[in-house]
Amino acid sequence: MRRQEPESPLVPSSPVALVVQKFGGTSVADPDRIKAVAEHIVATRRRGDEVVVVVSAMGKTTDELLRLAHEISAAPAARELDMLLTAGERISMALLCMAIIELGEPAVSFTGSQAGIVTDTTHTKAKILDIRADRLREALAAGNIAVVAGFQGVSTDSDVTTLGRGGSDTTAVALAAALGADACEIYTDVTGVFTADPRVVPQARRLSRISFDEMLEMAATGGRVLALRSVEFARNYGVRIHVRSSFTWEPGTWVVPDEELEVEGMEQPIISGVTHDTSEAKVTIVQVPDRPGVAARLFRALADEAINVDMIVQNVSSQGHTDISFTVPHADLARTLKVMEDHVDEIEAAGVTHDADVGRVSIVGAGMKSHPGVAATMFETLAAEGINIEMISTSTIRVSCVVAEADVNRAVAALHQAFDLESAS
C-alpha cells in the first residue's frame, strides 16, 4: 500500500530539529503498511529533521498473545505476561527498521529497555519513572533514524515491564519530553480529534486545535484517540501533539497548551465535543450508615485492590442511612463486588447492587467556564429525548451523565445537535 506524497509538506515547511512519530497497530498491520510507514518516515528525515519513531505491535498481535497466554493459564503470571507481550513491538520495530534501511536511510531499533525507559515494578501497568535517552541521542547524532518499541520499559529491578492500555502513546510523548522534541506526531486510523465519534454522529467535525485540558477530559470520558496518560505527560512537560491519520495526508488536530490558543486570540467554543463511554458499570452500596469514616473505609478497600473508581454519588441521608453509587471499569466489576461484599456486614450496610448496562455521556469545553446554563441545556436535551439521568458529575470544563446503555448513542447525537457542534467555527 503506497501513497503519493502531496505537494504540501506533511508538517509546516520550516525544518523541525527533532520530531517523534508514533504509529499504532493498524498503521503497521501488514508488510505493505509497514513499507508505507517507512516511506513516510524517510520523507520526514529527508526534509532535514531528526526522527525518533515509536511503534506498536502489528494489528491484533497483542490480542493474539493475550489469547495464547490465557490458553495456557487462567491467571498468567504478570512478569511472564510482560515478557510475552513485549514480543509484539519487537517484531514491528525490527521490520520497520528493515523497511527504512531498504529505502536507503540508516535506522537502528531499540527495545524500551535499550531506549532507557525506566519504570516502577508494577507489571502490566507500569509507570514511567525516568528516561535515560543517551543511546537514542547517540543514534541520532550518528545520523540514524531511531525506532523504539512502544508500550514497554525496564523496571528498577531490571525486569521487562509493560505500560498498560495506550502505552505506546505514553512512550512517544515521554520520549518527546525527554529529548526536547519540537513535536510529537501520533498517527492513528482517524484523521484527528472530532466533536463526537463519527460512527455515532456522521456530521461530527474534526477539530483543528484543542487544549491539553479539554483533551484530558475527552480522554478520560471515552475519547479513544489519545491515551489519558499520554495527554497528562504532554500537559506536564509542554509537549505539543499532532494527531493525524496514517492513511491520508489531511491535516490533523493539534493538542496544545491553553495559553497557545489564548495568544493566537482564538475564543474557545463553549463546547468542543461530546464523548461517550460504555466500558463502565455502576455499583451501589445500599443503606450505608451515615457517619464519619464509612465511605473512607469502602474506597480505601478499593484503592488497596488497585481498582479505579470514577463517578461517585451519595444520596441525601434519610434516617441515618444513605446510598453510595460509583462507577468502575467492567473489567474490575467482579473484583469490586467481592471487595464490597466483604465489607457490607462490617459497615452494617444493607447490601450491594450493580448495573453493567449503563453508559456515560459527557460534554467538554473550556468555554463553559464563562457561560452559564450549559448543564441546564444538557439536561433539557436529554429530557426531551426521554432519557433518564442516573448519575451526574462535573468539572470546570465538563459535565457527565450516566444513562442506560441503550440510550447512549441517541444522547450523543441529540447533544451534538443541541450545541450546534457540526457548524461551529
Language-model segments: residues:
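Nucleotide/pyrophosphate-binding catalytic subdomain
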Residues: 1-231, 327, 402-404, 419, ...
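Short phosphate-binding/catalytic loops that engage adenosine nucleotides
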Residues: 49, 105, 239, 307, ...
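Short hydrophobic alpha-helical runs that function as membrane-insertion/retention elements
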Residues: 52, 183-187, 241-243, 310-311, ...
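Structured, non-catalytic alpha/beta "coupling" segments that mediate domain-domain communication
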Residues: 97, 237-238, 242-243
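Acidic-aromatic/histidine active-site loop/patch
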Residues: 234
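Active-site phosphate/pyrophosphate-binding segments
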Residues: 247
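A conserved regulatory-domain signal marking ACT and ACT-like small-molecule sensing domains
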Residues: 252-425
